Design a protein with these regions (language model features):
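Peripheral terminal and inter-domain segments
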Residues: 1-168
Length: 168
């Protein structure tokens, strides 16, 4: 069953520990309204902090294909609100898994219990710079033989640039 995991294929840490941890990256204006992103390491477990104009959250990230439940996540746009309402399951939990795809690219995926949509975040670090891509996907229902008609998704996957905030 471990081969069936939908978690991103990643390593627990890069081959060398750089100074990505504990730094805040300020992001350029974007459709998601994300303002800052930071990556921290607490007791060997990565945590991602995200902030928008209205809210903020810190997510504990599961490693090695494990998913960790988080109680809070940002109010991300969802592709198909009607299906999300039909399959709502009660108290919302946000399951997060990820890790290092390379020495400079941290990937994490957020799947919520009441959404059919899920988001994958690709964080590419380059010195003082960060390139972030947020990819939104709709969970395919295996029992459906026909494609579910969708509206065009107004949030295209595109690169969001960020710059490391200088220490005061």
């Amino acid at each position: 069953l471990s081969h069936w995991s939908c978690a991103p294929r990643t390593a627990a840490q890069p081959s060398f520990l750089d100074d990505y941890y504990g730094c805040v990256y300020v992001l350029e204006e974007n459709p998601w309204h994300l303002r800052t992103l930071s990556l921290s390491l607490r007791e060997g477990q990565p945590h991602i902090s995200l902030e928008t104009d209205q809210e903020s959250c810190t997510l504990q990230v599961g490693l090695h294909g494990d998913w960790i439940a988080n109680d809070a996540f940002l109010s991300m746009p969802r592709e198909n609100e009607r299906l999300n309402m039909m399959f709502h399951t009660g108290p919302v939990r946000h399951w997060v898994s990820g890790g290092w795809a390379s020495d400079f690219c941290f990937i994490f995926q957020v799947r919520s219990t009441d959404w059919m949509d899920y988001n994958t975040f690709y964080c590419r670090f380059n010195g003082q710079r960060l390139s972030l891509v947020v990819e939104s996907n709709m969970e395919r229902m295996s029992h459906c033989r026909r494609r579910i008609p969708m509206r065009p998704w107004p949030y295209p996957d595109h690169q969001i640039e960020g710059k490391r905030q200088s220490a005061n």
